[in-house]
A protein has these predicted regions:
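N-terminal leader segment of winged-helix/HTH proteins
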Residues: 1-29
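Short amphipathic alpha-helical boundary/capping segments
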Residues: 24-32, 129-133
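Pre-recognition alpha-helix immediately N-terminal to the DNA-recognition helix
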Residues: 37-42
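Short capping segments at the starts of secondary-structure elements
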Residues: 46-51
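A short acidic, leucine-rich amphipathic alpha-helix
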Residues: 54-60, 71
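Basic amphipathic alpha-helical segments that dock to polyanions
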Residues: 71-81
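Non-DNA-binding regulatory cores of transcription-related proteins
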Residues: 81-159
Length: 159
């Protein structure tokens, strides 16, 4: 296995995400394997959404040999550790993203493009809203429609 990316240094780093993962592994008496850290490091380099297949391809292209089952299992661990979130957008395979500030997903029903937007008004509404006998941890808002690119293509096709 390739080790020139200093995975051992990465695993011992003071990065808050790495620390959170280490704490999760310790709390659950799980092994801290190089493969798990390879997966975590690659995920931390990704901005936005990704599928497990895309993640596997990135790891492979980096020259690491990590089995598909290890990638899937590590993704599940990262979800349990509250580092990743899984999204299953209508009609699409599962996508993942690092947990960040609350945001809305705009999903194009024509091309499948997913765009994230931060809506401070909606966030303020959710933070101020009190639900009877319920404490909100996080929320996901998916808005389905047609992106501007697909709308232009449809308009041109009509003419």
């Amino acid at each position: 296995m390739r080790t020139d990316l200093h995975i051992d240094d990465f695993a011992a780093s003071n990065n808050p995400v790495v620390r959170k993962f280490n704490e999760y592994l310790d709390a659950h008496s799980m092994r801290k394997t190089t493969e798990r850290y390879v997966v975590l490091k690659r995920i931390m380099d990704i901005n936005g959404h990704f599928t497990v297949e895309e993640l596997q391809q990135m790891i492979d292209s980096d020259g690491f040999r990590v089995s598909r089952s290890t990638v899937y299992n590590t993704v599940e661990l990262l979800i349990e550790a509250k580092i990743l979130r899984r999204h299953v957008f209508e009609g699409m395979q599962a996508q993942y993203e690092r947990i960040t500030l609350p945001h809305t997903h705009l999903i194009c029903t024509s091309c499948g493009k997913v765009r994230e937007v931060r809506d401070n008004n909606f966030a303020a509404f959710m933070n101020a809203r009190r639900f009877n006998a319920f404490n909100t941890d996080h929320y996901s808002l998916y808005v389905y429609g047609t992106c501007s690119t697909c709308a232009r293509k449809k308009k041109r096709a009509k003419h």
